[in-house]
Amino acid sequence: MVANPGGGSTDAGGGPVRHIPVLLEEVLAALAPAPGKLILDGTFGAGGYTSAILAAGAEVIALDRDPTAIAAGQAMVAAHGGRLKLVHSQFSHLADHAPQGGLDGVVLDIGVSSMQLDEAERGFSFQKNGPLDMRMSATGVSAADVLNRAKVADLIRIFHFLGEESQAPRIAHAIEKRRAEKPFETTRDLAGLIELVTPRKMKDKIHPATRVFQALRIFVNDELGELAQALFAAETVLKPGGRLVVVTFHSLEDRIVKKFFSDRAGKASGSRHLPAAHERAATFTAVGKSMVSASEAEAESNPRARSAKLRAGQRTAAAAEAADMSLFGFPNLASLGKLGG
């Protein structure tokens, strides 16, 4: 979610208004919340979607892996008389917090919350100087650990695959040279180096550090793996007719969601070079258009919405399929866990 420049005010749900929920009308149209329905918001953040779902009369189970978001959301919990349950959890574990086959909807907003972007000490933004952390929770390796310890070849893989950065080799070798002199500690250390080795051209629309910061954040938090596991989990907790709604912000995430819904449509995916594959029972059917993007008006008023894409599916009565990560064709980035140690 994107921070509200005004900040400081509160909404009807009792929580702070610090964000603009992206594609809110489209999310609600696809999710169809109503009294008597139970919806899981897997990415609570600043509570934008949850607040709107509650306003429609539904009950909500909301998850967030960030303890700061959970603490900030307690006022919203108190304001809704038992209709909101807020849980500190990664959304990949959503099946642990919902009845199997008992949900009417699941919504996931795959992005960094306003609270994380606003706090320099979290290290998510190159626009604010702070420690190179980028962890959405307090566990695991930090972005600084990755930069200071990973092999150059592994940095190139991270920047290229997760950030789609064309200058990955140049940046990785510059990082190797710089860390031999002094370890990376702050966001300014990294952003400054990237600006130095890949000067921004007049035609460029984004800061040269954008893709590297994105890649590090995704790697540190295993965001693609989390998303894939959440999609599989949602398939098990949605009742027939339940809706899965996912909002993504870059092409890697969108490809995962698109691949999942395409696969779960049950169509055979054989090749003319291989034996014919049998069609499977569909576990999801499409809801509305295959992909929805922001209107011109929303993109104008909320720049973050320009890259947002929404995909939604409706659960059928077919049995959930086994989770198979090979569906997405991820490279083995998990092998970087030791960071060259």
UniProtKB/Swiss-Prot annotation:
GO terms for biological process: rRNA base methylation. It is an enzyme of class 2 (transferase). Signal peptide: none annotated. It comes from the Bacteria. It catalyses: cytidine(1402) in 16S rRNA + S-adenosyl-L-methionine = N(4)-methylcytidine(1402) in 16S rRNA + S-adenosyl-L-homocysteine + H(+). The keyword Cytoplasm applies. Its EC number is 2.1.1.199. GO terms for molecular function: rRNA (cytosine-N4-)-methyltransferase activity. It is found in: Cytoplasm. The keyword DNA-binding does not apply. Its main location: cytoplasm. Gene3D superfamilies: Putative methyltransferase TM0872, insert domain, Vaccinia Virus protein VP39. Belongs to the methyltransferase superfamily. RsmH family. This is Ribosomal RNA small subunit methyltransferase H. It comes from Rhizobium etli (strain CIAT 652). The lineage of its organism: Bacteria, Pseudomonadati, Pseudomonadota, Alphaproteobacteria, Hyphomicrobiales. The gene is rsmH.
